Amino acid sequence: MTGNGLVERFDAPLSGLAVVGGAVRGLLRKTPAQPVLPRRTLRREAVLEAQAIEAYARLCGFSPEQGVPITWPHILSFPLQMRIMLGADFPYPAVGLVHVHNRIRQTARIEAGQRLNLTTRVGSLLAHDKGQAFALTTEATRDGQTVWEGKSIYLKLGPKGRGATVPELDAPSGASVLETWSPAPDLGRRYAAVSGDANPIHTLGLGARLFGFRRPIAHGMWTKARAIAALTPQAPLETAEVEAVFRSPVFLGDTIVLQAAPPVRTNNLFEVRDMGGTRTHLRGRLNLSPSLSSQPPEGPSS
């Protein structure tokens, strides 16, 4: 269920004071028995700045030949997502929400120097075994044409939620190890610097321990981006769709492996697992030729 609609424009960056204030308000506010998601639409214009893109791409393993990473518009839309989740009308505290699913689709090449208009909306409530999930969707347009779409699903831990079930993905069949990574202990701070996501569970030992983690964990979107960098061609993407389910945290300093069944093909499934192969951190699906008739990321609903 969603509330009344509001359309707002935010081109200024989200300040640290706004983040702290919104987080505190959320923690002090009691979650209602029947949560109502605000029907909000937030917009901003963003310039694809080459220096910022290069710093992000390098940290995530993209080569210069791959151009603007398909995940970069998600980074540009993150301040809009945070404004929604930190809002006084949002039923859940932003602190403690878990990013459990992300799907992005690019329908045209995106290049540095271009301007994108980003529109982020609140989607619907979704059912998850570990609590109540909800969706936030983003559309990026260039000269009035949609060139990128994204959908992120977040989870509020608690009793099983209501709504349509959060999507899952099958494990890849016949997969082998393609790459091995060891995320450095300072990766969380470095990723926060290039992405704007400074969640303390990724950047501080104390912040991680306060939420039950023995040490900081990698950002899920870094893990997804790192996998995309390894699986996609050494050339800018024209069209692609990448879906990921975040299944368990990656502790910084641990060794993890990327598994897939080469060669990469339409609807190729992949996984990021621990070195021993006993724990799945991320399960994904890559489609380098997405059909225009496939289902786009969901918009707002009631």
Where are the language model's segments positioned?
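Hydrophobic residues on conserved beta-strands that form the core of alpha/beta folds
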Residues: 39, 149, 239-241
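HotDog/MaoC-like acyl-thioester-processing domains
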Residues: 1-37, 79-82, 99-183, 249-252, ...
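Hot-dog-fold acyl-thioester-processing enzymes
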Residues: 1-101, 161-234
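Catalytic-pocket segment enriched in acidic/His residues
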Residues: 206-257, 261-263, 272-277, 283
